[in-house]
UniProtKB/Swiss-Prot annotation:
Organism encoding this protein: Acidothermus cellulolyticus (strain ATCC 43068 / DSM 8971 / 11B)
Cofactor note: Binds 2 Mg(2+) ion per subunit.
Function: The RuvA-RuvB-RuvC complex processes Holliday junction (HJ) DNA during genetic recombination and DNA repair. Endonuclease that resolves HJ intermediates. Cleaves cruciform DNA by making single-stranded nicks across the HJ at symmetrical positions within the homologous arms, yielding a 5'-phosphate and a 3'-hydroxyl group; requires a central core of homology in the junction. The consensus cleavage sequence is 5'-(A/T)TT(C/G)-3'. Cleavage occurs on the 3'-side of the TT dinucleotide at the point of strand exchange.
Main localisation: cytoplasm
The protein's name in its UniProt record: Crossover junction endodeoxyribonuclease RuvC
Lineage of origin: Bacteria, Bacillati, Actinomycetota, Actinomycetes, Acidothermales
List of catalytic residues: D18, E78, D151
Amino acid sequence: MAANLPNMRSIRRVMGVDPGLTRCGIGVVDGYPGLARLVGVDVLHTPADAELGDRLAALEDGLVQWLDRAAPDVVAVERVFSQHNVRTVMGTAQAGAVALLVAARRGVPVVWHTPSEVKAAVTGQGRAGKDQVAFMVRRLLRAPGLAAPADATDALALAICQLWRGAAMARLAAGGAR
């Protein structure tokens, strides 16, 4: 029976970050491929009328607190994709860069996932809608009552994606490096 239990070293803690200047989703999960457990979730907010530097500093402060409290093994950040609104893309990229910087200063590796990659990992469809992603996140985490906005469930989906796909991606990278 013990053969069915995961090796304690295989249990990982992943912090997902859905970057944004106005709303930055944070989601932390523990687990291994096929099983995820909710550790924490939040949305960091900055006022749209505040100076850019102040907004980035506020995101940094919030991300530092989450990284220090959660102590993740890896941080998964959503990769910026092309949008029609250049301002939104810039804000998302800047928030993602803050997450990268905060993690790098703590020696925590950062991985990037595209929205379609994340959607495929949690729903089986790369074009799933936000409602489908949120539904599956609640189901996969066995948290049907989780009341979290889309930014938060997107961050949890990022963390689940990395938790499940990260080990396979690392094995593929190692095999390709031989």
